[in-house]
A protein has these predicted regions:
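Positively charged, low-complexity intrinsically disordered leader regions
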Residues: 1-39
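Anion-binding alpha/beta catalytic cores of soluble intermediary-metabolism enzymes, centered on
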Residues: 16-18, 73, 80-151, 200
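Active-site cofactor/substrate anionic-group-binding motifs, chiefly glycine-
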Residues: 25, 30-77
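Short, structured coil segments at secondary-structure junctions
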Residues: 48, 98-100, 155, 181
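NAD(P)-binding Rossmann-fold cofactor-contacting core
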Residues: 155-178
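Short acidic low-complexity segments
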Residues: 181-197
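Residue-level detector of conserved catalytic or cofactor/ligand-binding positions
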Residues: 198-204
Length: 204
């Protein structure tokens, strides 16, 4: 995925014609607005020849005015892929469950996989490798941290979450990352100590 992203980034900056998604449609559900997410998905999909359709909070009352099952079936009939930026993580799970087309998790309150893919891509670009990176995240133990922990179950790293004691990440996600025995995971409440443990510092 990272190699493909690097190749596409090069083609984009060189203004090369790349119409892989010609005659394809992306439905973008934004229950939670974001300028960066909208601009990146919409620009990228249209550059690759597709059409991106924006649906804001007032267009769909997902899980309220509109049943998620019905919305999922509607998009599956008219579109080729869905990107959803939602609050409730269960909603993205249900959306994918009833969908017959790919569903991209643009963000939920639980995790933010696209952000972490971008972060690890940036690390790879600047450092030339993602082999055992030493990373410290400073901030609340939020959806960003949960996605880092999920990535730490797949590639080896030293990951430290430095957060206030009352704002720790989800205990179950921490334990799964530790139990995977792939990465070194630790939780710190001392910023000065934490920065000594890593080469890469991330904060919100």
């Amino acid at each position: 995925i990272l190699k493909l992203a690097k190749d596409l980034k090069s083609k984009f900056h060189q203004k090369e014609d790349f119409k892989h998604f010609k005659n394809r449609s992306l439905a973008m559900i934004f229950a939670k607005p974001s300028a960066r997410t909208r601009v990146s998905f919409e620009t990228g999909f249209e550059w690759m020849g597709g059409h991106a359709l924006f649906l804001g909070p007032n267009d769909i009352g997902i899980g309220k005015r509109e049943a998620i099952k019905d919305i999922s079936r509607l998009f599956s009939r008219y579109n080729d892929v869905v990107m959803a930026r939602l609050f409730d993580h269960d909603h993205i799970i249900e959306l994918a469950e009833y969908s017959t087309i790919p569903v991209i998790n643009g963000l939920t309150d639980y995790n933010h996989p696209c952000q972490i893919m971008t972060d690890i891509f940036t690390i790879w670009e600047h450092m030339g490798s993602i082999e055992n990176p030493k990373i410290v995240y400073m901030g609340d133990g939020n959806n960003i941290v949960h996605s880092w922990l999920q990535l730490a179950m797949r590639i080896s790293m030293d990951f430290v979450c430095c957060c206030p004691e009352d704002y720790k990440p989800d205990d179950g996600t921490i334990q799964k990352a530790i139990d995977s025995n792939i990465s070194n995971i630790s939780i710190s409440h001392d910023p000065k100590e934490a920065v000594q443990l890593s080469l890469i510092h991330i904060s919100e």
